[in-house]
């Protein structure tokens, strides 16, 4: 017989382990853009409570987040270019159209995204 204590301090919950790079992405790699928000919505609808995203540090040898050169820095490839356009840090002209494979491609993303980042503009916040 399975007993369930409604007043138990800890209830059983579940989640998913999926690295950010494994999300679909328009620029060669998954990012914290629209697809990440859609994935969170999917997790909520399917009753999941947790999303473990693994290390977010710059990848090292073999594109592994576990062999990073820094445990404190973040991987810039996970920054979503479309979000930067939406928030006026980039203009749509700063992002050139390019075909990427359907799988995660660090090499292609690394040769593309940093070039787009060079167009970043200072953003003033008006209070």
Show which residues each predicted segment covers.
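Acidic, His- and aromatic-enriched active-site or binding-groove loops in soluble protein domains
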Residues: 68-90
């Amino acid at each position: 017989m399975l007993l369930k204590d409604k007043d138990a301090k800890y209830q059983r919950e579940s989640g998913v382990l999926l690295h950010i790079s494994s999300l679909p992405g328009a620029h060669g790699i998954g990012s914290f853009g629209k697809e990440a928000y859609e994935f969170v919505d999917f997790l909520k609808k399917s009753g999941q409570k947790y999303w473990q995203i693994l290390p977010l540090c710059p990848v090292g040898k073999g594109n592994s987040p576990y062999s990073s050169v820094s445990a404190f820095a973040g991987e810039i490839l996970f920054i979503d270019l479309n979000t930067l356009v939406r928030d006026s840090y980039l203009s749509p002209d700063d992002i050139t159209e390019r075909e990427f494979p359907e799988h995660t491609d660090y090499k292609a993303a690394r040769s593309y995204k940093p070039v787009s980042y060079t167009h970043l503009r200072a953003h003033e916040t008006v209070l």
